[in-house]
Amino acid sequence: MRLQPLRDPRLALSLMLSLIAVVAAERPLDERAARPDEWGYRPADGARVALNPPSFTWIAPADAVAYDVEWSADPAFPAVGTTTAASVVWPTYTHDAPLAAGTHHWRYRARDARGDATAWSRARRVEVPAAAAILPLPGRAEQRARVPAGHPRLFLRPEDLPRLRELVRGPEAPALAELRAAAERYLAAGPTPEPPHKGSARDKTNAELIKYWWPNRVQVEQACTEAETLAFVYLLTGERRFGEGARRWLLHLAAWDPQGTTNFTLNCEAGKPLLHRPARAYDWAWDVFTAEERGRIQATMRTRVLEAWNSGEVARGVGHLQRPYGSHANRVWHKLAEAGIAFLDEIPEAPQWLDYALNKFYSCYPVWSDDDGGWHEGVSYWSSYQSKAAGWLQVAQTALRIDGLRKPFFAQVGDYPLYLAPPHSPNSGFGDLSFRPLDAPAFLEYHVRARAASGDGGNAAYWAWWAREKRQPANGGIIGLLYRANLPAPAAPRPPADLPASKVFRGIGVASLHTTLLDSREDVHFAFKASPFGSQSHGHNPQNSF
């Protein structure tokens, strides 16, 4: 059959445009393999997940600005029976409702700035067991609906205030007296000044910068403690002089130069506290500020958070979600979350900060861990990083009604030090600083208490015993009061005589074998390491070591 030329130019143009559209819609998707420092494609094909819904993650193509994600029980993805999430902004997606238990297949495609889509990725199979913990991620609209319209929002909600104020008039009166005395001292002494000298650890040959690197962080933390204490005492008492003190301190902090000695890029250790601790004080004393004063605080906070947002540690969210193994970067996301919650509706980017932090928490936190509670960097860095995560878990629960303890890691978070650094142990297994004994961290009280309200209590009684034997310091101040006010009583300490004497932390490749967990002076302890993380970050020990 001989083809005849098209005589209608409009029809020819229409067919040409249709052909272009088909070709554009089917442009290939770059599905390169993940590099060693990337999170990659998860759940992997054939994986069995512990959380429902699972977090789908993938490699972001260079020109991608959004994604569509589909999952179905049928690998052919028929129209009926396939769920589609469109216009996903991160290279990860967690649904806002649990999936049906069973086998699912998932795939994604990318869209560029014009809205043109790639072909779909290959399908990956995932098993969602009926016993998986339920932890859906609320979408942006639901995030806003859950956060109180008023203040406070961080650690407390407006409806919590009558109960807390009643407590400090009764059994918690000594705690209020302690906080009030501290606030009085701060009012008498005046605000801690802005650090006058630049400090940084970036140039190891510059002794002058290194000299002030850590002291500047200490000075910043002190100034923030003063502001938080004044704001919290005002929140509890309503006494105007403490509110005026909080107002003075917050405006003082807002006047510090974000490009000066506390600049995030120059010294992230001094800059990090200023991403979230002024937000706490602002939230607790919100009603003492005029609109003009709020604007000044908002402008400074926006400048500081945006510098962190654009830094290599966050890389505008997408960068860190793709490459989440940076140690310092894992201390930033929850600080952005607190700022996002405190300044929701006040700073334009605040909803983005919060949404990023939630997607980070769901899809790739913790990164140096396994579901058994292990921590690749060792118990010293486990202690440091989990002391910060404990604050986020409280904020997530109060502001967003998200129970982060449902994550398997947190359900077993205290097992790692129990097995790697039992009482009287002369060292603490593997990882940075493991040559020395581990002091019991105060934050473990949060988990010992919170496990009673989340699940069956798990091993909390054994953690309480470990903390007692290791002489865990008592939590005082604001955190101690919040623990007692918002959490159940801690589990009674129980010696781990009935626990297995050994445990394998499979995800970090560590086996810790004992003859007894009760006293290292009577124990034969043999530990092995063959970690899939290698010697990255603070997990310095060589492979196949013991």
Question: Each predicted region: which residue ranges?
Answer:
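Extended polysaccharide-engagement surfaces of secreted carbohydrate-active enzymes
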Residues: 381-546
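Pro/Thr/Ser/Gly-rich low-complexity, intrinsically disordered linker/stalk tracts
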Residues: 27-62
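Extracellular fibronectin type III
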Residues: 113-130
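Active-site lining segments of carbohydrate-active enzymes
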Residues: 211-214, 273-380, 390-394, 482-500
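Long, well-ordered core segments of solenoidal/helical folds
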Residues: 182-191, 245-261, 296-319, 352-373, ...
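Well-ordered alpha-helical scaffold segments within catalytic/enzyme domains
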Residues: 151-170, 224-240, 251-260, 273-293, ...
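Recognizes extended acidic, P/S/T-rich segments that occur
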Residues: 68-101
